[in-house]
């Protein structure tokens, strides 16, 4: 795989609140912002990872504010080869109009755009959080079907031939060799990489703190389901160019990825490939959530 340790001075990482725990906000819908959705807090330093010197400014484009995570991410954004727009099922943020607007933004600024929606470990997540197996399956099918229909409508309207705008479920990548290698390597690293394990465990704890009462506490099953969810999505944060065969790619979401500070930090360890970027894309006039 082509993801490597960053050279000093090449990748610059701002901070989010991953290592600065605080009370988590209440979830606003069934899947909230997904397990890998997070928040960004530039006011608190992070002692685990070395920070950079300058964070790119947000740019207004087609009704959105685009905030590349690092200077290298800004270059990838400017190159405009490819973008992944992540969509989580059961999240009211992704309305039909919002998806259409994101599709227009993507087509205006990138040669190719892929909407990627989560359809793996969804039912397991609902069941782990208390639904019966039957109810969890019903809820997952309903939410996945709904988000797929909305994205498909957008793609058919904006690019009927599918030449530049596509929709892909996460499950599609399970037969992709590059994805499988990235996923297998990630599982191996979780056993030995202290930083990676700490970041993922903290992410799991933060997510479950919004779902499980403080007196009840999270179970081992709940923690494992969350970890599986994270590991399923992480390869796209590491090296989408290797997975989809594009020169470079910008992973876009309306929140900062909690893994981003580690993936774009200086030094050794698990890092995103040099042609993999991340940007926070929010409706114009709203802060990065």
Curated annotation (Swiss-Prot):
It is an enzyme of class 2 (transferase). Substrate binds at residues 91, 229-233, 253. Changing residue 253 to F: Small but detectable amount of catalytic activity (200-fold decrease). GO terms for molecular function: aminoacyltransferase activity; ligase activity, forming carbon-oxygen bonds. InterPro entries: CDPS (IPR030903), CDPS_sf (IPR038622). Signal peptide: none annotated. The record marks 139, 229 as: Could be involved in aa-tRNA binding. The keyword Transferase applies. Homodimer. This is Cyclo(L-tyrosyl-L-tyrosyl) synthase.
